[in-house]
């Protein structure tokens, strides 16, 4: 089963996403900031990193670029749990694809 690392400053989103993946049978670890991410990557490399596009404490786009530069084969998905106002900017800046989910207090609802 793939090892997934979730990075996001918002504990409620990070926990919901981590628990959802864990219940689906994935090995999941989560961190709340970029320093913890780099520390984690110094010890072990996950199969996939999920990176919150709207973290205030670190530049998600810059962090994505740094991750891909240091670990070109590392799969990184940029996610967001807020409004879709910057979707085009995010996709144009770094993403090969963008998966959008609407967040409600009870979970994620897929939308196109």
Describe the function of each predicted region.
Residues 67, 73-85:
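A short, hydrophobic beta-strand element within the central beta-sheet of small alpha/beta folds
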Residues 51-67:
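Conserved phosphotransfer microenvironments
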Residues 87-112:
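Receiver (REC) domain switch/output surface
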């Amino acid at each position: 089963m793939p090892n997934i690392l979730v990075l996001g400053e918002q504990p409620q989103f990070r926990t919901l996403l981590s628990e959802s993946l864990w219940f689906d049978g994935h090995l999941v670890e989560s961190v709340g900031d970029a320093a913890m991410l780099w520390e984690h990557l110094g010890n072990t490399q996950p199969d996939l990193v999920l990176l919150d596009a709207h973290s205030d404490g670190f530049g998600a786009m810059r962090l994505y670029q740094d991750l891909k530069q240091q670990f070109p084969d590392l799969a990184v998905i940029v996610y967001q749990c807020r409004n879709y106002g910057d979707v085009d900017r995010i996709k144009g800046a770094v993403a090969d694809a963008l998966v959008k989910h609407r967040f409600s207090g009870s979970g994620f609802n897929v939308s196109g």
